[in-house]
Amino acid sequence: MLKKILVFCSILFAFQSMVLAQNEIVKPLTIGQTVTLKSKILKEERTLNIYLPLGFDKAKSYPVIYLLDGSMNEDFIHVSGLVQFFNQMYAMPQTILVGIANVDRKRDFTYHTDVKDLQKDYPTTGHSDQFISFLEKELKPYVESHYKTTDTYIFGQSLGGLLATEILLKKPEMFNNYFIISPSLWWDDQSLIKQAKQLLSKSPDTKKFVYVSVGKGEHPVMVKDAESIYDILKNSNKKNWTVEYKMMEGDNHATILHRSLYEGLVKMFPYKEPK
């Protein structure tokens, strides 16, 4: 008798599974698109992960965020969610996110150094000039030829923060808004910090938002360097620059990015109660 009950239950379960399978509809979940761009400057193909806001309209103009370390297995997915959240809950307009997937971030995000130990430990480094040229002459024109755009942002952390700082100081006109998280300004014996005042003296005083952040749990050199670049930027007498700083009390170098970007976006788009 027990055997018959078990057989009956097995048949019933199999039948229910078949019915459920017939009724379900499975579709892929898509949050963006992936584009392969052939770069003549870098002499390689580069992968772009692009998030378009809900209801994207080709006839409308949108701000664009350029995200360094923008691979699917890096920061693209969680930053896409942050952008969507700030559009839904805060005053952030609908925004396009362009994640730039890495090939060799040490090569692309660092400038030349004569420090022998760095040359030995990081043999491919020192080509940020080429990557910046790629951003300026190939990537941005590609994006602007496919979408109508307004303000531009660059998000960078660690070596990406070093690159974002280098662009801000040497080619500030490339972006309107700079989010510089835990920048590796120790690179090349802090030469970028040492040059900062001179470079800023040549920069036009056009409207900019600059956000610098570091985690309290990071190496003391990282904290000191972030504070130093913030102080230099804040005291540069740029009347049209908004310069913000945030010490992330509970974060270290590994945990800081998402929460710090959140805090930076809050400074740009503070919450307002709906009327």
Specify the residue positions occupied by each region the protein language model found.
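Bacterial Sec-dependent N-terminal signal peptides
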Residues: 1-24
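C-terminal catalytic histidine-bearing segment of alpha/beta-hydrolase fold enzymes
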Residues: 219-275
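A domain-start/cap signature at the N-terminus of enzymes
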Residues: 19-63
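Mobile cap/lid helix-loop segments that gate and shape the active-site cleft of serine hydrolases
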Residues: 170-207
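Alpha/beta-hydrolase fold nucleophile elbow
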Residues: 147-158, 178
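Serine-hydrolase catalytic machinery in alpha/beta-hydrolase-like enzymes
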Residues: 35, 64-134, 138, 142, ...
